[in-house]
């Protein structure tokens, strides 16, 4: 089988169409064309054509992988998954990954370090969440342990406290005790340990004093009483107290406030 002509593709000047015996047979990257010294008149066997096609698949996949990496650093698993989605064959993926590693495009330790630092600075995630994400990205346990150790206790507490303050601002209608529990629960879900979450919750709510809680309680009582005024006095009182307890106020605190402020649920005559 002889190459009878070679033409440059119109849409991609770095790819060439190869014609065998006057008929289009396959196309190759410019680098593959030069490597195999493809030219008009060259005779190729079927085995050699298959070899060239495989080499071109690797070259094409390598170009795609480099473009994929141009947007941000990736882990080896992310690149492998991407190439699979591009329908690359297994042999090509392995060879592409080896070439990328030789070119220093893949370094899972550097990726993990950069990813962890970025998450710490920009997302305020806890260490457990970052660990889980690194596992999903295919990092080894050894690498994960190494990079997570760089997330100091001081940095964790600082980030957890910042998160706690955000949570507190979104839930400023609850009693201090309930608010602290909400903060602890949310911080644990964000990847912090329960011990650190408790410290951060205490730190974030440290400036809330008795006067602040009394003001919150007053507003909640007024709001709840308006909502329940259509009920009989005894039922309205019960519903109001229940609602306030659900927001974290203790029964004794509610009763004391009602008594001290002479708040009655009896109908006015």
UniProtKB/Swiss-Prot annotation:
Pfam families from the UniProt entry: RecX_HTH1 (PF21982), RecX_HTH2 (PF02631), RecX_HTH3 (PF21981)
Entry's localization field: Cytoplasm
UniProt-listed Gene3D superfamilies: Winged helix-like DNA-binding domain superfamily/Winged helix DNA-binding domain (1.10.10.10)
Membrane-spanning parts: none
Keywords noted in UniProt: Cytoplasm
Biological processes, Gene Ontology terms: regulation of DNA repair
Main localization of the protein described in the UniProt heading: cytoplasm
The keyword Nuclease appears for this protein: no
CC terms in the record's Gene Ontology section: cytoplasm
InterPro entries the record matches: RecX_HTH_1st, RecX_HTH_2nd, RecX_HTH_3rd, Regulatory_RecX, WH-like_DNA-bd_sf
Function: Modulates RecA activity.
Protein family per UniProt: Belongs to the RecX family.
NCBIfam families reported for this sequence: PRK14135.1
PANTHER family: REGULATORY PROTEIN RECX FAMILY PROTEIN (PTHR33602:SF1)
Protein name: Regulatory protein RecX
Organism, scientific name: Listeria monocytogenes serotype 4b (strain CLIP80459)
